[in-house]
Amino acid sequence: MKNQYLPVLLLLSVVTLAQTKDMIPQTVEFPSGTLHLKAYLWKPAGPGPFPAVLFSHGSGGDKADLTAGMQITESADILAPFFIKHGYAFLYPFRRGHGPSADQAPFMQDVLLSEEKEKGRDARLQLQFKLMTTDQIDDVLAALAFLKTVPGIDIHRIAVAGNSFGGQLTLLAAERDSTIRAVVTFAAAAGSLERSAELRDRLIAVVRKTNAAIMLIHAENDYSTAAGRSMAEELERLHKPHSLKIYPKVGLTSDDGHNMLYENIPAWEDDVFKFLDQYIKG
């Protein structure tokens, strides 16, 4: 999918960048098991300690260096200025097989496509669930462990955020690490929840267990908003801190809606940072 709003987003990033200091990311390496993964790290100017957000990208398009129709490194560059502007350090890890970490493992979509061709759609969904709950979440947790060692990071004020498949991983991370204080998901499990009862049950179990505040975001024209609505319903039943935001349609297609994180930053910026400030800085 070609990102039709990318020139505008790049302009917004440039303007924000001009208003912020020290915006060149530090390329860092962290271990995940026997692998050596890469990440981009930004910190606000000053000594800190800073609250921090770890961001999990989606599972990619048809190439290992793409996400949401753009270069995966470019997506990191687009998002980072907004987090820095609001006073948050920002870590963008590249999971195994993706972007600068592509040399550490096969690209997940290639693995899933091969599984589907050989064994069918259901087998692909089962393998995707397995990878989500093993290798992929291991990489996120490894990045989180690394983040806590970075000088100038306040380890008591950490949030996780993610888009699409990465949004699912943020929820799993919050279940596994009780120090995470807030979760923000964009389009998590959109279109996947209806195809996998296993995934649906797992995500509901996650929101029952975690004590982190959870913000669930979709555009109205996402592939589906059922995942956010069902998790919000369970969180409401349990009286846990949460926010569900279903924003108006973005662009013309469901792809546009699914990628509203990048397509319409002005729509979510104030809401997301109000939420993060409440539960991370408050």
Language-model-detected regions and their locations in the chain:
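C-terminal catalytic histidine-bearing segment of alpha/beta-hydrolase fold enzymes
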Residues: 241-282
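The conserved beta1-alpha1 loop
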Residues: 51, 56-58, 218-219
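N-terminal cap/lid segment of alpha/beta-hydrolase-fold proteins
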Residues: 19-48
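The feature captures the conserved acid-bearing segment of alpha/beta-hydrolase catalytic domains
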Residues: 182, 188-243
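Short substrate-entry loop that stabilizes the transition state in hydrolases
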Residues: 48-50, 59-102, 192-193, 224-225
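Primarily recognizes the serine-hydrolase "nucleophile elbow" in alpha/beta-hydrolase
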Residues: 132-209
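Alpha/beta-hydrolase
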Residues: 56, 93-95, 186, 247
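Alpha/beta-hydrolase active-site loop
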Residues: 104, 108-151
